[in-house]
């Protein structure tokens, strides 16, 4: 593991039994409190997607905003928000998806993505891939194309990478953590 990735991984705190017993929460707020680690995170994602023909960057609520906005800015691209219901002011489309215990919904503005857009999705963590799957569906319903998704953290045993590849999306992750 190179020096930048070591810095990133060591800056992420692991909180046992949060938000419930048996879960190890990977806290990226500790990463963004270390400017060198935050910068390295953005730089590595930007470096992977320069000259890839990306036309828009989409970040999912809420931690995807933290990393997606600076990546979009560094690439000179528009940044699009995907949010929980009733948080966006203009006309939206919505997509429901399954959680471990229930269902949730994401929304985006109907005019945020257009036919022909080549979209990069960014979020902080890839677990099962449910959130990013719903985000992909929103983008495709608006005519956009998604071939890439970037994450700071991957929990490989939860199968998110395989799920994305089955959807034709190549995941890019910076650090893996075992256990969840």
UniProtKB/Swiss-Prot annotation:
InterPro entries: Ade_phspho_trans (IPR005764), Adenine_PRTase (IPR050120), PRibTrfase_dom (IPR000836), PRTase-like (IPR029057). GO terms for biological process: adenine salvage; AMP salvage; purine ribonucleoside salvage. It catalyses: AMP + diphosphate = 5-phospho-alpha-D-ribose 1-diphosphate + adenine. Pathway: Purine metabolism; AMP biosynthesis via salvage pathway; AMP from adenine: step 1/1. It is found in: Cytoplasm. Catalyzes a salvage reaction resulting in the formation of AMP, that is energically less costly than de novo synthesis. This is Adenine phosphoribosyltransferase. It comes from Mannheimia succiniciproducens (strain KCTC 0769BP / MBEL55E). The lineage of its organism: Bacteria, Pseudomonadati, Pseudomonadota, Gammaproteobacteria, Pasteurellales.
